[in-house]
Amino acid sequence: MNKELVLVVDFGGQYNQLIARRVRENRVYCEIVPYTTSIEDIKEKAPKGIIFTGGPNSVYGENAPRVQKELFDLGIPVLGICYGDQLMAHSLEGEVTSPEKREYGKTDVNLDNSSLLFKDMKEKDQCWMSHTDYISKVPKGFKIIATTDECPCAAMENAEKKLYGVQFHPEVEHTLFGKKMLKNFLFNVCNLKGDWSMSSFAEQQIKAIKEKVGDKKVICALSGGVDSSVAAVIVHKAIGKQLTCVFVDHGLLRKDEGDQVERIFKDQFDMNLIRVNAQDRFLGKLKGVSDPERKRKIIGEEFIRVFEEEAKKLGDISFLVQGTIYPDIVESGTNTSATIKSHHNVGGLPEDMEFKLIEPLRELFKDEVRAVGEELGIPHKLVWRQPFPGPGLAIRVLGEVTEEKLAITREADAIFREEIAKAGLEEKIWQYFACLPNIQSVGVMGDERTYCHTIALRAVTSSDAMTSDWARIPYEVLDKVSRRIVNEVKEVNRIVYDVTSKPPATIEWE
């Protein structure tokens, strides 16, 4: 089955992944590609539509991102957003100008609803502006289809060539008609069907993995988290017993997690599973290491070394499966965005790794991964399991990792998760966990002065981990969690709750 494809061309804007999500919400498959992608590569991909993202540059900047002018003559509908709008105008000999007054935030916009882009919309609505330049003269063959008080060309079109540009950001919630506008572009301009689904994605991945692997042997990096679990099941459905799952118990797991993973995948799914007890090995490598990036790199490298050793025991292994998902790739940086933190499945891989990679989920957001898991028949409880980073509790114990600190964090986290479940909040909160911030403080217990650890509780709401907000957990639940931890976990005398959104913070503390 050939899927309809929309390309999102990345010019370094902060909302690029949100654009991709908006497209996929319409059951249309899209890929984000760098602006340096050649015309030949674009032709080979044969997209049904192209979207230019925003970006921080001016079209007149010395190193401003460009595209080949030929792209506009391919007969493929193009939608330019913000910088993408200005670039289209500049490339086609329109004029872009810096205004006296910058336009930023919620703005009233006048729409020409005779345009396919604004079909069935109000003549005046609210949009979100964030720009310093604007189009002062549209290219030949274009007409203005939207204006604001400060922007004489808030949108333009060449309906004959199916070229559209908008100065505002339709992908954000503050543009009240944005989702409808993108839907109009996809279905009225690009004439797409919207038939991409998680079931079709799974079918295509299974077929592709069969073809890629052939009769070769595959090893899977299984952590028991949602991502690696879904990846393992997809590959298992494709090649069966050619797959061996290696579960590295590095001593950085949550309470009782190792036994649960072994029971589910060995007994329930009938997979070839090897459990490697490597706690001492990992803690030895992490001894004296406090820097979070070094911890991630060390753990990533040691994981691969363990896999290589297990692979040699198994014989001729050609491929390694990883549960890398799209936000992992984004957070590890691209050519047009800054690196936020190295992901263990990306930045931590040694350059001399001996396996070819299979990453069946690298194009999916977390909610899409869960949907694939449901399609594959993975138990609901496992599919909705809490996200857990590959480095495990090593990045929830701030500073040097020791057995004592791990034990404290593990017990506190188990209590937090247990009380969240009792309160019926498991599926209402995206992610929740306890971490040890490496802070000690004075307290009083049993009429005696104490100087013990602080536990930080973190809980966030999100749909894809790209952005998140802190969860409004009822006070009575937080109160019970706090009282239980200080009473049941030794060396803890203070509990704090993290009320920071992402951005500016990341979900994990390290």
Swiss-Prot record:
GO CC annotation terms, alphabetical: cytosol
Residue stretches making up the GMPS ATP-PPase domain: 196-385
Pfam families (UniProt xref): GATase (PF00117), GMP_synt_C (PF00958), NAD_synthase (PF02540)
GO BP annotation list: GMP biosynthetic process
Catalytic activity: XMP + L-glutamine + ATP + H2O = GMP + L-glutamate + AMP + diphosphate + 2 H(+)
Function of the protein: Catalyzes the synthesis of GMP from XMP.
Entry protein name: GMP synthase [glutamine-hydrolyzing]
Domain of life: Bacteria
CDD domains according to UniProt: GATase1_GMP_Synthase, GMP_synthase_C
Subunit structure: Homodimer.
